[in-house]
Amino acid sequence: MDRSGYFNGIKLCGKVQVVNSFPDIKVQVVSSFPDLNVKIVSSFPDNIGEWQFVDSFPDFTIQYVDSFPDIKIKFVDSFPGIP
């Protein structure tokens, strides 16, 4: 992940779908030292770290993993983005 909030050309905001296989990004949820702070929003996920979970037509897909993640995230209520 780069400092501008992109991972392999994927802007880390928008509509996100959780999948069990072949994700765009493998994500590990952590409580400290995340790569990205994520705020779950119900609409307008326009800023880095704002994710709206959907069942179809995602901007990108994620898979939750316990090891070897592409990025580590922490769910927050405020101040989403790169810590």
Q: Can you name each region flagged by the protein language model?
A:
Residues 1-83:
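Repetitive, compositionally biased segments used for assembly/scaffolding
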